[in-house]
C-alpha cells in the first residue's frame, strides 16, 4: 500500500509525499469540474478566504499568505511563482523544479519507513520529468541551483514579517 502514489518520501519528509496535499475547490455556480496545475499553498488560505469574505488585511498581518482566489476559481492556471516548504530542511518548488536545501539530518526514519530528504548536498529535481524525485540533477544545472538558493536567501532575509 502506497497512499502517496508516485511521490517519494512520506509524512515529515522534504520530498513531495511529505508536503504535497490534494486541494479541492467546489463552489456551485462559480467553479467547473477540472484539474488545475496552478501552484498554491495551504498558507494562502488566510489571504484568499479574507478576500472572499471581504475582509481587508494587510500584508503584515498575513505574512507569507497570498490571495489565490483566481487560481481557486480556475481563472489563473499559474498561481504562485514558487512555494517554500519546510520539513527538517527548506525547499523551493516551482512548476518545473524542486530544490531541497542541504541538511545533515538523518536521511531515513526507520520507525515510519520514510525517506526524509536530508542530504548534505544540494538536491534539484526536474518535476516535469521526475515527479517522484529520484534523479538529483543539481550537478548538471548549477544556474537553476543558484537561482533557487537565491530565492531561499531572499525569503529568509524577510524574517517572519510579523510581531508575535
Positions of PLM-derived features:
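Active-site-proximal N-terminal segment of extracellular/periplasmic enzymes that hydrolyze or transfer
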Residues: 135-143
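A generic structural signal for short coil/turn motifs at secondary-structure boundaries
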Residues: 32-35, 134-136
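C-terminal cap/loop subdomain of S1 sulfatases and analogous C-terminal strand-loop tails that border
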Residues: 1-16, 31-32, 38, 43-123, ...
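The feature captures the short pre-catalytic strand/loop hairpin that immediately precedes
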Residues: 23-32
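Charge-dense polyanion-binding interfaces
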Residues: 147-164
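Intrinsically disordered, low-complexity polar regions and short flexible loop motifs
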Residues: 130
Amino acid at each position: 500500500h502506497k497512499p502517496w502514489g508516485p511521490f517519494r518520501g512520506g509524512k515529515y519528509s522534504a520530498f513531495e509525499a511529505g508536503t504535497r496535499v490534494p486541494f479541492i475547490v467546489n463552489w456551485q455556480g462559480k467553479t467547473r469540474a477540472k484539474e488545475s496545475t496552478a501552484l498554491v499553498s495551504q498558507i494562502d488560505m488566510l489571504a484568499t478566504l479574507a478576500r472572499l469574505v471581504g475582509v481587508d488585511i494587510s500584508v503584515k498581518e498575513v505574512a507569507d499568505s497570498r490571495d489565490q482566489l483566481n487560481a481557486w476559481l480556475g481563472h489563473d492556471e499559474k498561481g504562485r511563482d514558487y512555494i517554500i516548504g519546510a520539513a527538517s530542511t527548506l525547499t523551493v518548488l516551482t512548476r518545473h523544479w524542486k530544490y531541497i536545501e542541504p541538511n545533515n539530518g538523518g536521511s531515513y526514519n526507520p520507525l515510519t519507513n520514510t525517506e526524509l530528504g536530508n542530504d548534505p548536498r544540494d538536491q534539484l529535481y526536474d518535476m516535469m520529468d521526475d515527479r517522484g524525485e529520484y534523479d538529483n540533477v543539481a550537478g548538471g544545472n548549477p544556474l537553476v541551483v543558484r537561482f533557487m538558493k537565491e530565492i531561499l536567501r531572499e525569503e529568509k532575509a524577510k524574517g517572519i514579517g510579523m510581531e508575535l
